[in-house]
Amino acid sequence: MKNKGFKRLTSAAIVLALILSVFPSVFAADQTEFATREYVVSEFVQSVGRNNLTGSDYILSTFSDSDQIDEEYVGDISKAATAGIVRGYEDKTLRPKENVQRIEAMVMLARCLENTDDIQPVQDPIVFADVPDWAVDDINKLSAAGLVEGYGDGTMGAEDSITVEQVKLLTDRSDAALNTVEPGESFYGYVNNKAFRNADLSSSTTIDAKHGAIITQENAWSHFTDIYNDVTEKENDLLVQLVEGDLEYEQGSAAQRIYDMLMCIDGKFEDNPDDTELFESYRSMITEADTIDEFVEAVNNIYKETGINLLFSISAVQNSETGKMEPGIAFASMGSGGIISYSSSATEQYGEEYKNLIKEYLDILGYPASDSEIEKAYEIQETTSTGMELIYVVQYVYGLMTRSIIDPDFDEETSDAILESLIEEHPELNALEEQTTATAAPQEIYSIEEANAIIDNIDIGSMLSDVGFYNIESVVPSLTGNLEACEDVLTESNLEALKINALLQYGLSIKAGSTQEELDKLNELVNLNSAVVTGLDPDRYAELYAAFMEQQVQDASDTAEETDETETIDPDTERILSAENMQELQNLMPMDIGYLYCEYYYDESTTAVIQQMVDDIKAAYIERFKNNDWMADETKQNAINKVNKIRSTIGYSKEQLFPDIIPVSEGGTYFTNTLRIKQNDLRSVIAQCGDEDYIYDIMLMSPDIQNAYYNPSLNNICILAGILNAPIYDKDASYAANLGAIGAVIAHEIGHAFDANGAQYDENGVLNNWWTEEDAAIFQEKQQEFVDYYSRFEVIDGVTQDSLVTITENMADVAGIQCVFDIIGDDREAQKEALESFATMWAQIGTSNYLTSEQLLQDVHSSNQVRVNACVTTIDAFYEIYDIQEGDPMYVSPEDRLKLW
């Protein structure tokens, strides 16, 4: 069969390479790099696969010189020693730094392969004159499998020292023999077979390499999780150094802000009469309001002085008619009443408990309320949550994801049951998938006068101008139907209920200043909200989450201890970096740890490299549009204009606004610095609405996250520093390899400008139909082609993904990878590098249950093996490089290969 022929051809080529490699070493012996025992053992263990072996620290410790092993090799040598691959010398030493004879290396390789069924004989064993009797069986096995050919003179150079180059050739051949997936069967599985064998999993597994599925356990792995773990480890180490005074930093840096805020958080319960008086004064403004006008005035004054709006959620939203950023406005949800009432089962299970918690909190404040007023406050919370239905669904999904992380007993049946119950109660959720391709609904925009006319007893224009918004002529409702539903909320009859909700909102918005008793009750309220979306009992959720956070802190301590085993973490450091303190820091300053990472680990030269790649990809898109054979000239020019106007922010934003955090030594406190943070949040929203460039220069998420995104309403892309790590971006890799990975990501994000959703926005990010009627009709047909094309690829045998849900991501994937190959041109080696780096980037292992779960199958992204295999089948070079023939599962006839632009 053709597939076997491909494997034999590959093996023969590698064998030939080994034979030929002997001669250069004869003439350049002084340049030969010989391999040490620790290097050889580690390479062989990785070739066979770490997941096939189990290590034991105890067994390794029985060798007297185990402490001489380099840290990077310890884990692999532990596994090799436990499996008997390396057995040491009679004097109980391993001699890890010594060079290794070829015969010794070959025997270790044979031992690695003892429990592997994938190494099969392809020829008769070769008889070598210099192989000792004790090694004959092992060498016969290797030579029969075509892994050892010797020097061609009847010897194998048994006593010669093995070189690094020869070790690499042996591992390459072993990898080829162990790779049970052919490129014509699953390119994703073919490229990532070795990665799957070496993924960092906790126990031995059975892996379906074709799909990247674990059959026997629930661990998961991907390069993205590896990068996340590496970034997190670096951040934890920085935090320990920072707190212990071992990190130098400048005033105004993320390190300075984090350090001084942590010191304030750590001393949050220190007595400060001035802070207490100020904190209570804002609370008194609420409780002492006797009329609705006084209440609104109090809310506005608090907003002006603290940046906290107790009635409204104010954000920056684009005006779809003008492209300008305007204040987005909706009533604040004021608590958990909305999400509890969204689910009848949650209402039944948590409704009364929630109201009782509010009552208990008010009693602690010394502001008792009747049951009827609390009931009215709850009803107002329901009303003010109008328009948040989709947000609640997202919260449920993220809640269940959180549960899967913190709850060892989590099972997917529980998750599916919760989501199915929601869908049954809210059938409109079934239509969500159609929103990925539906025409965006026209946006409602209100003049200030129109907004004031909807809601009684509030002057929205004055409220905004008083805090610094200027030249505001209109506002954008950020939640559909929200303002209209709340038109009668601000009435005298609701005054007490509004004050209850405002007190609750105040406590939740600024915990600084609250007593421990107040905080404990607020935490119960927060845990109840989390219980709703995770399906856990509130106490159980609190217990699991606390344990998870403590483990994160312990990981930080372990990282620091590993840096120098003679040092221990200072008890004060452990206290300052406690789970509670770190959670509060993250809540208050969600971007600062990401900026801390960038300050110490982001290579500034990367920005220019990635920007050049962005420019190259934009040029490739423009050429595609110029040469497009189905778009009218007018539509082509509109598309080209849009590409030219795409802006990019790379790594992190240098324009992001941050608060001045005042050190404790200069009078800074937990409360006053928290107010500075809240005021800065407001300042950022004002800047987004008032400075036309600012919104394009900032990022909407922390730069350490492994992500990139396109914003259709801004027509810009952001490539975050967290994703600019190997193997997604490797500064030492070739341009072609990086194009296949981070280049494909960039091209994907630009592709979103022209997917089923992004294509509805023009070059200014305005919702505007720039298509001719005929072109729009063809574009719709193209979308159906994507649905049909992706339906042929399986997530796992017998299971396909809903390609209607994933259509926008699939369109961006295909358009992106095809632009990448336009840039590469006809260079076969570069094409091969790009294809394999693309597949490598998306390597992921998940359980077969996870891969086929309803949650994943409804993800807007195709599962990783589908997005790789579907994309590469659209590239003609793929078929030529890997000899993909008709009849192979990966084969698609030329006329059926997907093409968008």
Language model segments and positions:
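Second-shell loop/turn segments in exported
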Residues: 30-31, 62-67, 93-96, 126-129, ...
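Sec-exported extracytoplasmic/periplasmic mature domains
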Residues: 45-53, 81-85, 110-118, 144-147, ...
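Active-site-surrounding "flap" and adjacent substrate/cofactor-binding loops of secreted or lumenal enzymes
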Residues: 182-186, 190-265
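Short, glycine/acidic-rich hinge or "gate" loops at secondary-structure transitions
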Residues: 205, 254-257, 367-379, 394-398, ...
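Noncatalytic, helix-rich "gating/capping" subdomain that lines the substrate-entry/channel surface
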Residues: 229-608
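Intrinsically disordered, low-complexity linker/terminal regions across diverse proteins
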Residues: 587-590, 594-901
